[in-house]
Amino acid sequence: KIIVNRLARKVEVDSIVVPLPFSSQELSIEDSGSMYVITTPAGLIIKWSHLTGIIDIHFGFRFNLSSYTEGLCGICNEDPDDDLRMQNGTIITNMEDIGLFIESWEIEKSFEVTMRRPVRNCTEHDCSQCIDLLNRRIFIPCHDKVSPEDFCEKMWINYTYFWNYECDALSAYVALCNKFDICIQWRTPDYCSLSCPEGKEYQPCVRPCEARTCLNQWFYGHSSCLNLREDCACKDGTILHRPHSTQCIPEKECACTDSEDQPRTAGEIWNGGIDECALYKCLENGSVIPIEPDCDEEPTPVCEREAEVVMGIIDKWTCCSKEVCGCDATLCEPTIPTCTNGEKLIVGHSPLSCCPQYKCECDPLKCPSISTPECREDQFMIQVQQEEPCCFSPFCVCESCTKPVPLCHDGEFLTVDLNSTHFCCPQYYCVCEPNLCPMPLLNCAEDMNLVKENVFGQCCPTWHCEKDDVCVFQEVSVLNPGQSMIKYLEEDFCYTIECLEEKDNHTGFHTLNFTLVNCSKKCDVHQVYTPSPSDYDCCGTCKNVSCKFHMENGTSVVYVVGSTWHYNCTTYECVKTDEGAIILNYTMVCPPFNETECKMNEGIVKLYNEGCCKICKREERICQKVIIKSVIRKQDCMSQSLINVASCDGKCPSATIYNINIGSHLRFCKCCRENGVRNLSVPLYCSGNGTEIMYTLQEPIDCTCQWN
C-alpha cells in the first residue's frame, strides 16, 4: 500500500517512509520540487501540485486502453457504464448511491468526505454568485475558452464546498484557463493570497515542471510542462536545496550536504557525530572529508564557588577538550531546617554556591480552610493573623468616614437616619423645630409693625420693624405695590404714578415712580383718534376706519370696509372688527400643471384666474400642405441651398363602429395625402466631375383627408 501525503511532503510504502525517487513494478514516484509526478503501470501520468493541490492527469506514451485501471477515475476502456465499479466489483447505477462508490475506495478515514452529487443545474438553481465572480475584468481573457456558465453549471453548483470558499473555486477556474496557456494574475495581497515557505515567492504563471535544485543546477534544462500553473518559486539568486525540500539557498551553499541533509558551503567545518565528536569539512569540489580537531591549550580556570571543582569536557562544536568549573554535589554539607505546621521546605540556589539552600516558607495550602465573609459596600477585607504565624483569616473592616457630623443652628436638633444605622458611617442631619426658635427682642415704634421674614436655608426667621407695605402720594392717596394712577395736566400732557416693589429708605414706604406722557398723536388717513376709556391709561389710540394696503412698489391704496381686491394671486378683503378695520387675505390654489408635458403633446399654455393659474389647451391641426426646407442629394450631387418642398401633414378622422348586423366592429380611417402632384426641377451640383444637372422630383398640389 502506497500513501502520498502532499501536505507532509512524504511518501509511505507499507507504512514506511521512503526517499524519492521511488520505483516498484513499473510504478514510479518522484518529487520535482514543485509537484509529485506519479507514473502508473498503465501509462497514466499524475501530476499533483504542492502549492494548490490540483491534480493533473495525462496519458503517457505507453498508455493503451488494454491497460487495466480502476478506482475513483473509473475503468479507462471507453465504456462509461462501468466507471462506477466498487472495490468488490459491484457497479453503481443509481447516482443517489455514489457515496457507497466513494467509500469503497477510501483508505483510513481521517477527515470528512464531501460527496459530489451532480443533480443540480443553473436553470433551476441560483448560480449568480459564481457568475458574478467570473465576470470580473481579470477573468475575461479566458471566457472564450472556459465560459463562466459552463464552469458554474458543471462544477460550482454541484460542489457545495465552492459555495463557502470562493478562492478555491477561482483557483479551479484559473487551472482550467492555464490548460489553454492563458495567464491570469488574479491573486492580490489582500484577496486570496497564497503564503509561500520562507525564501520562496508566489508566481502566478510557471511552466517548468522541474524546479532548479542543487542536484540539477549544472544540467537544468527548463523542462516544460504542457500547461501553465501557479507555484511558489525560489527568489532570485537562490535555488532549491533538494527536490523534496522547501529550503531555498544561495548557489554557493550547494557545495556539500551533511548526513542530516543540510547544505554546507565550501570551507565550512561541522560536527557530524551524534554521540561522539566527528569533524567534517566541505571542499570546493563538493567532497566531504573528515578532519582532526585543531585545539589550543587553555589555562586551567580558577573555581571560586562553594563545592565547585575543575572538570574536563569535550566542546561539541570544536571537538576539543577543555577544563571548566562544575558543581560537585558530594562536597555539599546541607543544613535542612525543621518546618512547623503551615510551612513548607523550599530548595533554592545561590549564584555564589553550587550547594542547594534550604529554608522554610509559609504554605497557605496547609492552613485550615475558613469561609470568606461577604463585606458590605462600605467595608473592605483584611487578613488577620491566626495563632499560626503563616495562617491568616479574612475579616471585614469599615472604611474611614469622610463626612463629618453636621453642626446644628438655632431651632435645629441632631438626628440620625434610621435606615443607615447598620452602616459604618450613619447619616446624621439637622431637623428644624420652629418651637425651639427664640422669641424676638425688638420693640417697634407706634407707626411701625414687627415683621417676620423667613430666610432660605435657615430654620428660625429674622424679625425687624417696618412701615406699612404701601405707597403714599401727597399724604392723601394710598397705593398698593403694582398699582398706578393718572394725573392730567394742561394741553396734551399727563403723568402716571406707579407704586413700585422697592422701598424708599428715607420714608420707609414703597417708592413712587412718575412718568410724563405726551398724548399728542397724529393718526393716518384711514384712522381716527379715540380717547382712552380707562382711568389708568393717559392717552387714547388711533383706530382704523378703513384699510390701507401697501404694494411692492412702495405705494399704498386705501380701501373702505367691505371692499375686496386681487394682488399677486392673493384675494384681500377689508373687514370691520371691534378693534377697527383689518385686512384678511385668501391665497388662490391652482390644480397641478406640467408645462413640459403640455408642450410635448403639442398643447398651448393658457392662463386663467386673473393670470394666476395655467391650463393646457390642445388644438387639432387638420390635414394641410406644408412647406419643408431641405437639401436635395442624389449620389455625389446636391443642391447648393435649401429647397422649399411641399409635403402633407395633419390629422384626419378615424373611427371604429360596432355593426350589429355582422356582429363585429367596422374600422374607418382616412389619411392625409396628396391631391394631385406636380414636377419640381432642382439644379444639383456634382462634386465628382464639377458639372451641374437638373433633378426632377414630385410635390403635392394640395392635401386632403382620403380613404386608404
Curated annotation (Swiss-Prot):
<dbReference type="InterPro" id="IPR050780">
    <property type="entry name" value="Mucin_vWF_Thrombospondin_sf"/>
</dbReference>
<keyword id="KW-0325">Glycoprotein</keyword>
<feature type="disulfide bond">
    <location>
        <begin position="648"/>
        <end position="703"/>
    </location>
</feature>
<feature type="glycosylation site" description="N-linked (GlcNAc...) asparagine">
    <location>
        <position position="553"/>
    </location>
</feature>
<feature type="disulfide bond">
    <location>
        <begin position="616"/>
        <end position="672"/>
    </location>
</feature>
<dbReference type="Pfam" id="PF00094">
    <property type="entry name" value="VWD"/>
</dbReference>
<dbReference type="InterPro" id="IPR014853">
    <property type="entry name" value="VWF/SSPO/ZAN-like_Cys-rich_dom"/>
</dbReference>
<protein>
    <recommendedName>
        <fullName>Otogelin-like protein</fullName>
    </recommendedName>
</protein>
<dbReference type="InterPro" id="IPR036084">
    <property type="entry name" value="Ser_inhib-like_sf"/>
</dbReference>
<dbReference type="GO" id="GO:0005615">
    <property type="term" value="C:extracellular space"/>
</dbReference>
<dbReference type="InterPro" id="IPR001846">
    <property type="entry name" value="VWF_type-D"/>
</dbReference>
<comment type="similarity">
    <text>Belongs to the otogelin family.</text>
</comment>
<feature type="domain" description="VWFD">
    <location>
        <begin position="1"/>
        <end position="113"/>
    </location>
</feature>
<feature type="domain" description="CTCK">
    <location>
        <begin position="616"/>
        <end position="708"/>
    </location>
</feature>
<dbReference type="GO" id="GO:0031012">
    <property type="term" value="C:extracellular matrix"/>
</dbReference>
<keyword id="KW-0964">Secreted</keyword>
<feature type="disulfide bond">
    <location>
        <begin position="652"/>
        <end position="705"/>
    </location>
</feature>
<feature type="disulfide bond">
    <location>
        <begin position="637"/>
        <end position="686"/>
    </location>
</feature>
<keyword id="KW-1015">Disulfide bond</keyword>
<dbReference type="InterPro" id="IPR006207">
    <property type="entry name" value="Cys_knot_C"/>
</dbReference>
